[in-house]
């Protein structure tokens, strides 16, 4: 197996071209650039390829391109290797499976349709559209909660952003929480921690010249806060009002956070 792995390794990795916050040569995100070189690991987000096949977890690795850890899985009989996002409490040597049918045991790491998962269970790597691959709850320590089965077609799911939305029962999801839960406790004690990740120092717009930023120049106040490109900032929604998926949002994340505060205050 080791000899086979040495040959397959080059097919799971590739070089990664650094964008440094640019889009077609123009600055899209300020204060980005200068990160360490890294190789990109190909992650399998569409697990329906390996339907009803047992996947053997060979090892759990660190991935510099994302906050969560990744797990190297293999189908031993066929000699196939690929990476998936690792789940918390997933151990080396365990077996996981993807199935469209109802699973006998709700083991952490198994993937199935939302209609087969009971209410009150934490899930991650959720599809938004059927057979489109996982899109939601892929960052470290994130998970979503199935609140209730809304009807035969949809389930009401509470995302990690506190947003409550309807998701089709035919969409696939993985049971459990994404790995590396302790990442939120990590502190950047030195500037080099940020520079190695490609985050450069941020200059306030107020300290710039008028030609460089809407807040620049001696005159203070008189206008609403804006971004460097001139768009309104601070407590202004950037989501398109005509977006098709807005019809599936029952409670937005802003409204849900206000409701949670009111419940705590009594």
UniProtKB/Swiss-Prot annotation:
Tell me, what's a Pfam family for it? Ribosomal_L2
Compartment(s): Mitochondrion
List GO molecular-function terms, semicolon-separated: RNA binding; structural constituent of ribosome; transferase activity
Asked if Zinc is a keyword of the record, the answer is no
Keyword line:
Mitochondrion, Ribonucleoprotein, Ribosomal protein
* Any GO BP annotation: mitochondrial translation
Ranges in a coiled coil:
none
Q: Which InterPro entries match?
A: NA-bd_OB-fold, Rib_uL2_dom2, Ribosomal_uL2, Ribosomal_uL2_bac/org-type, Ribosomal_uL2_C, Ribosomal_uL2_dom3, Ribosomal_uL2_RNA-bd_dom, Translation_prot_SH3-like_sf
Q: Which GO terms describe its cellular component?
A: mitochondrial large ribosomal subunit
SMART domains listed in its UniProt record: Ribosomal_L2, Ribosomal_L2_C
Q: Which PANTHER family does its entry note?
A: LARGE RIBOSOMAL SUBUNIT PROTEIN UL2M, RIBOSOMAL PROTEIN L2
Family of this protein: Belongs to the universal ribosomal protein uL2 family.
Report the protein name in the record: Large ribosomal subunit protein uL2m
Annotated source species: Dictyostelium discoideum
